[in-house]
Amino acid sequence: MDLDQISETLSSVAEEEPLTMFLLDKLYAIREKIKQVPFSIVRLCHVYCMLIKYNASNNNCILGRKLIEEMQQFLCGTRVDGSEDISMDLSELCKLYDYCPLLCSALCRAPCVSVNKLFKIVERETRGQSENPLWHALRKYTVTATKLYDIYTTRCFLEYKGQQFFGEAVIYGAKHERVIRHLVATFYVKREVKETLGLLLDPSSGVFGASLDACFGISFNEDGFLMVKEKALIFEIKFKYKYLRDKEDHFVSELLKNPTEKSFSDFILSHPVPVIEFRERGKIPSSREYLMTYDFQYRPQRKLRTCPTPAILAPHIKQLLCLNETQKSTVIVFDCKSDLCEQKLSVFQKAVFTVNVFVNPKHRYFFQSLLQQYVMTQFYINDHNNPEYIESTEVPSVHIVTAFFRRRTEEERSLHLVIDETEYIEEEIPLALIVTPVAPNPEFTCCVITDICNLWENNICKQTSLQVWAQSAVNQYLAACVRKPKTP
């Protein structure tokens, strides 16, 4: 069975019993055993039941085996060695579905470390992201980073549409993501490229989820489970297709010939809608572009566009601007050396400099970064031996990477692109990166998380007339992220 068939079958299983139907069917029975059940536990049980139903009818392709095995051990009430192969009698799998209330009860009584392990299994089982059918299925009932801005500003929940057809810009971005990740690792972080992670479901609420483009400062234990270390770095990658040009383009050639901030700003302004939005200090930006500056080098000739700030964001926007305007971006300009004998194009760093460019807090990408940092911080807190002693400088941080490429020349089309001994065959040539740190306000992040948890609970109540408890970890997050006063 190929990936498309698996995705289609899994999607049909999810549609047979959506989350709302699952709640209506099971929550009353669950509450007979446990009066107040956190939704994070219910969410794990829903995932388990969805996998049980899928695997019962598709025994030639078992999905989520490790998660099923681990949760069956909770049902049995005993903890056996995880390496033991539990028998997967598919004729019995559907019967296990009826034990959902018992499973919820067992999970509620289980130690936090055991429940957190289940969320790590979910992450491991969804690696590959868009190429993993389980990743798509679990995003359906999750407030992901890409949805956060729309939900927060519109107060509405939109149904996840699953896999869709995308334009050339998105296809190009996906095609070059691996190259950009490699560039960040080699020339910015200067660490080994790590495996991409799966879906990080928020262990506290079960409502939020994040999928990271790149992450450093992590490791994997002997079972392949994620371990988040101190000062982990998260990178959100953006490929700027609208700047993809030939090497002979005047602004591209000038940047390669003399890589300075002046030639770089000229390159940025060469597009009718520059990727960096200029505003005079004290002025509120539009929400069109996710990068902004007060530097007059980036001021365009055309009239600046304005747009109103969403009402719910308006009281916070100036403070968020003040936090982020102090950040500086790093620009790395690349070129390549051709070796016709070995048929290679070796990428090298031609210049690096800082610019007064920062993230626009009115843009959806800022909110995307907030949720990524919030969820990743939950995993860090859960992995920490003494969470109460976590310093604000130790928690994960987020950077947005803006990548510019140029098209291959006719002579370069047959050559392999080489970055740190890794070869790429079809990708275009890296031109520059802008690496921009995001400065979140922990209090604002907590406000957004709490607000959306309440919205989500009310939305479920409207659909099912059920009161669901979406527990958040905003207090733990705030304690970790806010700078602690120095002791005398």
From Swiss-Prot:
GO terms for molecular function: DNA binding; endonuclease activity; exonuclease activity. The keyword Acyltransferase does not apply. InterPro entries: Herpes_alk_exo (IPR001616), PDDEXK-like_dom_sf (IPR011604), Restrct_endonuc-II-like (IPR011335), Viral_alk_exo (IPR034720). Its EC number is 3.1.-.-. It comes from the Viruses. It comes from Human herpesvirus 6A (strain Uganda-1102) (HHV-6 variant A). Interacts with major DNA-binding protein; this interaction increases the nuclease processivity of the alkaline exonuclease. This is Alkaline nuclease. Plays a role in processing non linear or branched viral DNA intermediates in order to promote the production of mature packaged unit-length linear progeny viral DNA molecules. Exhibits endonuclease and exonuclease activities and accepts both double-stranded and single-stranded DNA as substrate. Exonuclease digestion of DNA is in the 5'-> 3' direction and the products are 5'-monophosphate nucleosides. Additionally, forms a recombinase with the major DNA-binding protein, which displays strand exchange activity. Keywords: Endonuclease, Exonuclease, Host cytoplasm, Host nucleus, Host-virus interaction, Hydrolase, Nuclease. Its main location: host cell. Transmembrane segments: none annotated. The gene is U70. It is found in: Host nucleus; Host cytoplasm. The record marks 177, 213, 236, 238 as: Required for function.
